[in-house]
Amino acid sequence: MADKEKDAVIVDETEHVDVDSKESKKEKKTKQQQKIEFLEAEVKELNDKYLRTLAEAENFKKRIQAEKIMDRKYAASSFATELLVPYEQFSKIVDFPSDNELLNNFLIGFKMIRDQFKSVLENEGVVEIKALGEVFDAKVHHAIEKESNKDKPNGTVLEVLQNGYLFKDRILRPAMVKINEWSEDNGEDK
C-alpha cells in the first residue's frame, strides 16, 4: 500500500504542477501580449515623431528657399536707396530755372541723362510714390506739415516736400508731404 500512496502523491503533485504551469503560461502570454502592445504603441509614437520631424524639416527647407528668393529679389534695395540722394540732387539742379540760354542748352542734355537714369531705376523696380493731389496714406506718405485750404478735400496732399520711392513692393522711403486739414465747423486748422 505504501507504493499506492506514493503513486497517488506523485499524481497529485504532477496535476498541481500542470495546473501551475497552465496558469504561468497564461500569465506569460498575458505579459508577452502586454509587452507587444507596449512596443507597438512605442513604435507608433516614434513613427509619429519621425513623420512630424520630417514635416518640420520640409517646412524649414521651404522657408529657407522662400527667404533666399526674397533676399535675391530685394538685394539691390540698399543700393537703390543710396542712389536716390544723388538722383534727386541731380534732378533739382536740372530743374532749376535759368535765363541763360547757353546754360539752358546744357540743361536739356542733362535732363535727357536724368530721364535715362530714371528709366534705369524704374526698370530695376524703383518707382516714385505718387503723392501730389492724392489722399493721404500713412503707409506711403509722411505728413510733415499741414495747411488749411477750403478748396481742396480734407486729407489731400497739397505739396510734396521730398519724393518717396518704392522698390518692387517695399517702401524705400515714404514721401514727405504737406496735407490739407481743414474743419468746416470752425473754418480753422484742426
UniProtKB/Swiss-Prot annotation:
Keyword Cytoplasm in record: yes
Which Gene3D superfamilies would you find in this protein's record?
3.90.20.20, Head domain of nucleotide exchange factor GrpE (2.30.22.10)
Known PROSITE patterns for this protein?
GRPE (PS01071)
Write down the InterPro entries for this protein, in alphabetical order.
GrpE, GrpE_coiled_coil, GrpE_head
SUPFAM superfamilies the UniProt entry points to: Coiled-coil domain of nucleotide exchange factor GrpE (SSF58014), Head domain of nucleotide exchange factor GrpE (SSF51064)
Q: Which UniProt keywords apply?
A: Chaperone, Cytoplasm, Stress response
Instruction: Cite the GO molecular-function annotations of the record.
Output: adenyl-nucleotide exchange factor activity; protein homodimerization activity; protein-folding chaperone binding; unfolded protein binding
- Give positions of region: Disordered: 1-31
Check the UniProt entry and state the signal peptide residues, or none: none
**Subcellular location per the Swiss-Prot or TrEMBL entry:** Cytoplasm
Give the record's GO biological process terms: protein folding
In this chain, composition skew of type Basic and acidic residues spans 1-26
Keyword Cytoplasm attached = yes
In terms of Pfam families, this protein maps to:
GrpE
Which Gene Ontology CC terms are recorded?
cytoplasm
Q: Which family does it belong to?
A: Belongs to the GrpE family.
- Family annotation (PANTHER family): GRPE PROTEIN, GRPE PROTEIN HOMOLOG, MITOCHONDRIAL
Q: What does this protein do?
A: Participates actively in the response to hyperosmotic and heat shock by preventing the aggregation of stress-denatured proteins, in association with DnaK and GrpE. It is the nucleotide exchange factor for DnaK and may function as a thermosensor. Unfolded proteins bind initially to DnaJ; upon interaction with the DnaJ-bound protein, DnaK hydrolyzes its bound ATP, resulting in the formation of a stable complex. GrpE releases ADP from DnaK; ATP binding to DnaK triggers the release of the substrate protein, thus completing the reaction cycle.
Q: How does it assemble?
A: Homodimer.
User: How is this protein named in the record?
Assistant: Protein GrpE
Protein source organism: Acholeplasma laidlawii (strain PG-8A)
For this protein's source organism, the top of the classification is: Bacteria, Bacillati, Mycoplasmatota, Mollicutes, Acholeplasmatales
